[in-house]
Amino acid sequence: MNMALAFNKSLPGLCTLDSYKKHFVEFNDWLKNAFEHQTVGSLVKARARFIDEVLVSLWQHFDLHKHKKISLIAVGGYGRGELHPCSDIDLLLLTDSKLDAQQKEQISQFITLLWDLRLEVGHSVRSVKESVTLGKEDITIATNLMEMRLLTGSKELFDELQLQVCKNSFWTSQAFFQAKRDEQQQRHAQYHGTAYNLEPNLKANPGGLRDIQTIGWVAKKHFNTRTMRELVAYQYLTEDEYQELMECEAYLWQMRFALHVESGRNENRILFDYQPAVAKRLGFGDDGKASVERMMKRFFQTVQRVAELNDMLLQHFDGSILNSQSKLKQQKLDDFFELTGHLIRATDNAVFARRENILRMFWHIANNSNITGIHSDTIRLLRLVRRRLMGDLQDYEACRQLFMTIMRHPRGMDRAITLMHRHGILASYLPAWRNIVGQMQFDLFHAYTVDEHTHRVLKNLYRYSQAGFENEFPLCTDIVKRMEKPEILYLAGIFHDIAKGRGGDHSELGSLDAREFGKLHKLSDFDSKLLAWLVESHLLMSVTAQRRDIHDPAVIAEFADKVRDETRLNYLYCLTLADIRATNDNLWNDWKGSLLRELYLGTQKAFRRGLEKPMDLRDLIREN
């Protein structure tokens, strides 16, 4: 079939199932071929228009157009005029009274034929009053009605419903915003609050398409607009932010379109089985894992951008447009930052001209447990300065000092490290970290990207000293309490997988990175060696416990010989537990825990019986 800018085949003259099936085959073939030449935005609109024509034709075929008090209305994504190859087609049949037997039969035949055409159709038959009542009770129905579009039938009924939906009595801006934010938080919780699952859901994952839609829904409701573009004029978002959102949406749409084509169904989870074919269709090549890595890395970087914009814009809408922050108490933190409610806020738009103030902000977050996040105004500033950075933040002496202060802070691995990860500051600080952002892991164990796995390791390490978790791993809690320098443990967590994806032994390469870090940050020789050894040996204890007979004295002696002393054993044990537990939510079990504990206690006993190798105590005393 020749490629054209638009599908130009006429609808079948005879309304038979076979003729319409043939028409759909021709259109779907055109749609697949057009993907190589046209934007996805134009194609999802083309499918919506195609379905419009089919529905109107069938509506007339079943004589439904003769009933003057029925409207056929597209709602949801179809209402927006956007349909991916296998997307649901959501319809509202709006009536002004109860249907008679003839009307019910005609509608039944109409819907049945759509199902026979294998369309994913969801439909409801309601009056204006019923639609409004249900919309007031259910935020999902309310959202669908906000995006309704008349296909055919009574415009009078459609206008009446639209008038009711636009009223403040239907949903106030404040109530609608709160309901959509709660809905989003519940959805995010289903995905453990992360977009970095290796088989993500393109729609529902944090940072996915639903998060982009939520940004628009809350503002469209308030300003009574139809498109995201209109919101720039209302100063809800800047032109640059709008363009960035559209760029992110376009890439997620490309992936979703290709996924529907490859799976042949309304599939939004990009499972491992589909990833190679989708990567090939998107032009990332046909070289297996490498193609998938390139595609997924861009995906994870995209959803990170969306998640940050979503956080910033929803907060901005709540605080500045709904004015919820006008009465919040403000507290000065220093010359550069203040606390507005529970959010840290820069006092000056030029505050980040001094690069160390970026790290200073995160030190405040670690130091003040009342701070739960960053103010939207300050996120905007942070995004701007992040793009203009020349070199790495670790190049600045003042930044290095503050980074190590955060590492040494008792709460440095709490909210501060999470926000540094979320807002790209770890990547701006450590050049090696940038390489693992969105880095896939192709094995049977890891459920998350390298950077998200590492973030989870750090959170697990922090739990050893966190109030309320003393009974989770009491041995680790006791060890960390006695640790002279727990920051070495946290740094080992940061570097343990930092060389993945480069080729070669990631433990050895990461150990070299750790040595360079120690040198740059003026760690003592003892601390640098301990850090480098932990990174190089971070798999040693796990492999020994799970693949060797730990009840064999020779195995214990061999392991003790590699570990050398009880100090290293303590650090390695705590790191190993945190690492395994952050790999996969289903990987950890009591059996693995007991194996590691037995290996730890057996090796500790061996050291205390005199197998511990002598250390250079003079160096240790001199350096500490």
List each model region and its residues.
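Regulatory modules associated with amino-acid/nitrogen control
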Residues: Y251-L252, V292-L343, R415, H423, ...
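Conserved catalytic core of two-metal-ion nucleotidyltransferases
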Residues: A48-V56, F62-L64, A101-L157, Q254, ...
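Divalent metal-dependent catalytic cores for phosphoryl transfer on phosphate-bearing substrates
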Residues: G81-Q106, A233, M246-E247, W253, ...
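A cross-family structural signal marking well-folded subdomains
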Residues: F317-P431, Q439, R608, E612-N624
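Active-site flanking loop/helix segments enriched in acidic
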Residues: A34-R47, T194-A204, L343-T347, R400-T405, ...
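Alpha-helical phosphate/pyrophosphate-handling elements in metalloenzyme active cores
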Residues: F50-I73, V218-A233, D240, A447-L489, ...
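Conserved nucleotidyltransferase catalytic core and NTase-mimicking acidic/glycine-rich helix/loop elements
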Residues: A4, S10, K21, F170-I321, ...
